[in-house]
C-alpha cells in the first residue's frame, strides 16, 4: 500500500502540478482545500483535484473560524507588517496548517505537502506550524524541490494536461481570502512598473469610482465590528459587505515592497478594502477609550505581534502572551465610528463611546471649561525640575545648540 501525503490544494498552478509530481514519487495524494472567504468555486476545485490524480479531496469551510479566531486579532491588534501589509495571507496559514494536520491524522498520512516556493514566507509558516502541532509529520515542498521557473512549471502542466488558468503572457500569482487579496509575479516584479488594472479585482480604479460619497457608521463591541449602520452582522459577513462597499470606492489598494522572512525584498500588490476601513475606525475608537499609557505602549506590542504572525510563529508561547495582552486592552473599545468612503479614501468623521475618556468640559476653551489651569504651574515646576537642575549645574544649553 502506498503512503499517503496530504496536500494543501488551492486549484492553482503550483498545487495542481504538485499532485502529479507527488504521484510520480510514489505517493497517494489526499488533497485538502480550505474556504477562508476567497469566493472560489470549490466544486471546481474539488473536481480539479480528483482530475489531476488525488485519491481524495477534502473541502473545509473555515471562513467563520478564520474571521472569529484569526482576523479578530488583526483588528483588535491593528496588525500591519511594516505599516503597510494587513497580513491576510499570513493570518490564514496557521489555520490551514491546523486543518491539514487534522486531515493527516484522520487519514493516517505520513506527511503534509504544500505548494510554496523556496524563496517565499509561506514555506516557513506552514512547516513551523506543522512542527508545532504534530512533530511526527514529514513536510514536503515539491515546488521548492523541483526548483522550476514559472515558465517551466507552466510547460509541465501543459505536458501533463493539467488545467490551469494561467499563461506566459499573464503569469500572476494570486492569493485571496476574506481579509484581502495579494498579487505578485509578471510585470509586478518590476518595482518601478505601474500595476496594470488587470492586477486588481476587489477595488475600482479611481476613475471608475462613484462621484458621490457613502458615509457609514461602524459599531464596535470590545474591539470587534458588529454593525454597519445599525444592522448586525457576523464578522465574516460584515467584512465581505465592507469589501464590496469600500472596493466600489477604490479603497484598499496597497503597492508595497516588503522585506521577506527569507531575506529578499518582494514587490506585492495588495487589496484590502474592508481591512483599511475597519482598522482606521478601530484606531479612531481607541483614541477615546484607551488610557494614554496603554495607547502609547500598545503599538509596541502590535509591531511584535505582526512580526510574529508574518514570520510564521502563531503557535508559540510569545504569541499566546501577546494575544492575552491585546484582549486585555479591548474591554472598553466599544462604540460608533462614522466614516466617509470616497475616491480611494476612508475618512473618519466622528467617534463616540459609552466608555469614552474624552471629557468635553475639560477639553473646551469656552466658558464651560472645567479644567483648573492654576494646577499647571505646579505641574510644570515638577515636570521641568530635572531640566532646571541640569541647567543650574551644567550651564544649560546655548542658543546654537
Curated annotation (Swiss-Prot):
L-citrulline binds at residues 85, 121, 125, 173, 258, 270. InterPro entries: Arginosuc_syn_C, Arginosuc_syn_N, Arginosuc_synth, Arginosuc_synth_CS, Arginosuc_synth_type_1_subfam, AS_cat/multimer_dom_body, Rossmann-like_a/b/a_fold. Keywords: Amino-acid biosynthesis, Arginine biosynthesis, ATP-binding, Cytoplasm, Ligase, Nucleotide-binding. The keyword ATP-binding applies. SUPFAM superfamilies: Adenine nucleotide alpha hydrolases-like, Argininosuccinate synthetase, C-terminal domain. Its main location: cytoplasm. It catalyses: L-citrulline + L-aspartate + ATP = 2-(N(omega)-L-arginino)succinate + AMP + diphosphate + H(+). L-aspartate binds at residues 117, 121-122. Pathway: Amino-acid biosynthesis; L-arginine biosynthesis; L-arginine from L-ornithine and carbamoyl phosphate: step 2/3. One of its GO terms (cellular component) is cytoplasm. Disulfide bonds: none annotated. Its EC number is 6.3.4.5. ATP binds at residues 8-16, 115. Homotetramer. Belongs to the argininosuccinate synthase family. Type 1 subfamily. This is Argininosuccinate synthase. It comes from Staphylococcus aureus (strain bovine RF122 / ET3-1). The lineage of its organism: Bacteria, Bacillati, Bacillota, Bacilli, Bacillales. The gene is argG.
